[in-house]
A protein has these predicted regions:
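Cytosolic, long alpha-helical scaffolding segments
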Residues: 1-217
Length: 217
């Protein structure tokens, strides 16, 4: 009976983490919709709605702390709880990057200039795929999926480098657009950092499954 209650609590934690991922994916998609359409109302909504994701992280951490104090889990169960706490922190930071993208959109404002967004959108899409895979790998305890997350991170790193070079070159060609392009450089960096956090989530899954630090690269 005690074990059944514990497993139900663990499932609730896992479901809350899944909800966090759904909210974060939605936030990132909306942030890029705002960027592509220059819609400040959507950008502001992303910023305001971030409180929902923050609240979910707090709920996960409070419940995990309560479980550890009450049940005193050891070994695999303890690793599972600690991994979820660490992953929820990573998800919250990714949501913060969606907020940062929205703030950059507001700084860019309405512009008639054609900004190079295609590669940034591709980076966003890869990052979202990584986040979904990271969650699935944890839920299904699938280390192969966790490895796929790390492989995708290499694609993000390559796009980050290519975008940086292209945007710096664009500033030199179009100095009148420097302020807008600098904001795109920030967005490029936010996406690269988001992918790094998702890679850390995959490594947390590997630790949970293997019981030791496990190199996925």
């Amino acid at each position: 009976m005690i074990r059944e209650s514990f497993e139900n609590n663990m499932l609730e934690l896992q479901n809350k983490m899944g909800e966090m991922v759904e909210e974060t994916v939605a936030a990132m998609e909306k942030a890029f919709t705002a960027l592509e359409t220059q819609d400040m109302t959507i950008a502001l909504a992303v910023i305001e709605e971030d409180a929902t994701i923050d609240a979910l992280e707090n709920e996960i951490n409070q419940m995990a702390t309560w479980l550890m104090a009450k049940q005193q889990p050891v070994s695999r169960d303890l690793r599972r709880i600690l991994s979820m706490m660490k992953m929820s922190t990573g998800i919250e930071r990714i949501a913060d990057f969606a907020v940062n993208v929205s703030k950059a959109t507001i700084k860019i404002g309405k512009t008639d200039s054609l900004l190079p967004l295609t590669s940034l959108v591709q980076m966003k899409d890869i990052s979202i795929e990584m986040l979904k895979k990271a969650l699935k790998s944890f839920v299904e305890e699938d280390i192969v999926l966790a490895k796929e997350v790390v492989d995708l991170d290499e694609q993000v790193d390559e796009k980050n480098y290519q975008n940086y070079k292209a945007l710096i070159g664009l500033i030199q060609q179009q100095p009148g657009q420097a302020e807008e392009i600098v904001q795109l450089l920030f967005i490029n960096r936010y996406l690269e950092r988001a992918a790094d956090h998702i890679t850390n989530m995959a490594e947390s899954t590997a630790y949970f499954i293997k019981g030791q630090l496990f190199e996925l690269n």
